[in-house]
Design a protein with these regions (language model features):
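Non-catalytic protein-protein interaction segments used by genome-maintenance enzymes to assemble
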Residues: 41-98, 102-104
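A general structural signal for short secondary-structure junctions and capping/turn motifs
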Residues: 24-26, 108-111
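A non-catalytic, helix-rich entry segment at domain boundaries
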Residues: 1-44
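Substrate-binding beta-hairpin/strand module that engages nucleic acids
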Residues: 67, 73, 109-131
Length: 131
């Protein structure tokens, strides 16, 4: 599944139908994207390694911004509402996404407050904002 999405640099706005697909549209002129980007860094006295599924960078009037998108293939549980599913995904992956934010802030010199965190939920084609 990751291979399919990592092949997409940008999706044309007219082809983006679902919330997940809309996250693959270039947000602004000059935006750049990392896809399946591995990293290693020494932070807080320990080595840390990971891999970003997708990171989008752009600038606005206040400076550089970034959005970390992580694909999740979890399924909705029997009887679970979409809102409950999104809440469960946010809770399950919050720690991982906060670690990604801290790593990206260090690697790209972007304040953590300017880094968005989104889970791209493949099974529902939805998006869950973390924090």
């Amino acid at each position: 599944m990751h291979e399919r999405f990592s092949a997409v640099e940008w999706l044309s706005p007219d082809k983006a139908k679902t919330a997940l697909e809309k996250e693959l549209v270039r947000p602004a002129d000059g935006a750049t994207v990392w896809r399946e980007r591995a990293y290693e860094l020494f932070r807080d006295g320990r080595w840390e390694s990971g891999q970003f599924d997708r990171v989008v960078f752009w600038s606005d009037a206040d400076g550089r911004r970034a959005k970390i998108c992580d694909y999740k293939t979890n399924a909705v549980r029997n009887g679970e509402s979409l809102d409950a599913f999104k809440a469960r995904m946010r809770e399950t992956y919050r720690g991982q996404m906060l670690a990604y934010r801290a790593a990206l802030a260090s690697l790209a010199d972007i304040p953590p407050s300017r880094i968005e965190l989104k889970l791209l939920l493949v099974s529902t084609q939805g998006v869950a904002l973390v924090e």
